[in-house]
Amino acid sequence: MAARLATVACALFLLSSALLRLGCRARFAAEPDSDEDGEETVAFPESPPQKPTVFVVVLARNAAHTLPYFLGCLERLDYPKSRMAIWAATDHNVDNTTEILREWLKSVQRLYHYVEWRPMNEPESYPDEIGPKHWPNSRFSHVMKLRQAALRTAREKWSDYILFIDVDNFLTNPQTLNLMIVENKTIVAPMLESRGLYSNFWCGITPQGFYKRTPDYLQIREWKRMGCFPVPMVHSTFLIDLRKEASDKLAFYPPHQDYTWTFDDIIVFAFSSRQAGIQMYLCNKEHYGYLPIPLKPHQTLQEDVENLIHVQIEAMIDHPPMEPSQFVSVVPKYPDKMGFDEIFMINLKRRKDRRDRMLRTLYEQEIEVKIVEAVDGKALNTSQLKAWNIEMLPGYRDPYSSRPLTRGEIGCFLSHFSVWKEVIDRELEKTLVIEDDVRFEHQFKRKLMKLMEDIDKAQLDWELIYIGRKRMQVKEPEKAVPNVVNLVEADYSYWTLGYAISLEGAQKLVGADPFGKMLPVDEFLPIMYNKHPVAEYKEYYESRDLKAFSAEPLLIYPTHYTGQPGYLSDTETSTIWDNETVATDWDRTHSWKSRKQGHIRSTAKNTEALPPPTSLDTVPSRDEL
């Protein structure tokens, strides 16, 4: 009996335990947990991981002109500054690079996780260099040692990534760092743009370690192929993932024991990467930023300043302007008129974007202009045209689409005509006229001032000088002007992008009384210097002795051509001159006139107008295509 009771008791215990367990499960499944006071306990979701840490290396020498904009781009990277460290070094300066970098570091050190500052005030130059842009072996060695010290510090700090970026590289895309990290490569670089084909990568390398031209380079550089590509060399700006095991084998200095190539920091590092079994990658999926073309060893810091200016103004064609860091002082600019009595910039009031870009572009070049509010062809009506006695030149037809004159072209003509009138009224001896859709050649200001100085010295009798046009005489060379390099006698041309005009030239153009026999202004000018190919048009203008010349090579070009993104024409997208109900929109298919300059035969290229090459021109610049 006792044994049976014990068995029953044991069974009841086991059953109650099972029921308790089932009850607990049911309760947890059906009811939220609560504390002793009856309050519910909620399970919070896990937070995302923090961004990887990035160790940024800044090596600066004679960079007072680039630093404000470089640092501004660095500040605007969309990445938590608390997850970034700055390792900055500067040496061998003849400008105030040290002061600018110190000013910035003091202002931002509280924002970044870690800041290390390594200035060296003396000496100002390397004993074996010929100028501040020269790279003797002593400079290569010093830079490689600095990069190695930075790499060692990044490893000691357990940084996830290290970003090397030259101080004349401008990451204008704020997402660049995030985009490179996402690629998950040991070494990866964003493709940077320059005014030429130069960039921060090689697609080919010879067995001796020299640059090798390949078809792939152009395909990648011009975005004909887009993606992230394996390449033998990236330089100037690149990201290294220090979490990857193979990265432990990377070194900048000393060179690998098997290294026999040229003593150059970027080639030494590419060899190190190869020996470590690490593939370098170059990405061109987006536009990331800009870099200048390297100068030759004999070139000066002033030329480097001009390099920066050109990078800035080229970037503004399709993107917002580069702004300097808010934490450093910027040297003020002092615009002038380059020796002209006046510089006019013609702009439609409704094209504020063009006006703003041009004003900033001209300011960066220290050029002072007066804005001329253009006559808007869209606002012209028949009554106004009659009041001004405007009639189209009989028989005129556009050379490509065979359409008559448009009101947009009339507005353009009247805009230029108003400038000529002001030149006469104010008795301006030497005037420059530019339109609002131009891009400037490298060293524009220096080259134009030198050209005008040479013209004055030669006492050339001139009345019009094109600085931007579309040359239509492509089979034979235009005649070079004796004693003035970079100047030719102008032949038939399209476009009025920019030109210098004298008082006598303005008087001849206004005196031709063109309102009653009007055609586009860029067709009118060749008639006035007797180079228009259509004889019938010339018959309506008796005096055709305008003394017209052109810069060779040209100094300005259109920002966009027909068919390119951003191309816009206010002259062709308009209405017929005498019938505002007939629209003219030939831009997309018929506007050959607005297309890029066609091929000029080698026999037509004017070498007589160019200065002879010097021995310095043959000195190769570092890493130049």
From Swiss-Prot:
Range of residues in the leader sequence: 1-26
Highest taxon in the source lineage: Eukaryota
Family, similarity comment: Belongs to the glycosyltransferase 25 family.
Segments carrying motif Prevents secretion from ER: 622-625
Entry keyword Glycosyltransferase: yes
Subcellular location per the Swiss-Prot or TrEMBL entry: Endoplasmic reticulum lumen
Alphabetical keyword list: Endoplasmic reticulum, Glycoprotein, Glycosyltransferase, Signal, Transferase
Glycosylation sites: 96, 184, 381, 579
Protein purpose: Beta-galactosyltransferase that transfers beta-galactose to hydroxylysine residues of collagen.
Species: Mus musculus (Mouse)
GO molecular function: procollagen galactosyltransferase activity
Catalysis performed (reactions): (5R)-5-hydroxy-L-lysyl-[collagen] + UDP-alpha-D-galactose = (5R)-5-O-(beta-D-galactosyl)-5-hydroxy-L-lysyl-[collagen] + UDP + H(+)
Name by which UniProt lists this protein: Procollagen galactosyltransferase 2
Location of region: Disordered: 597-625
Gene assigned in the entry: Colgalt2
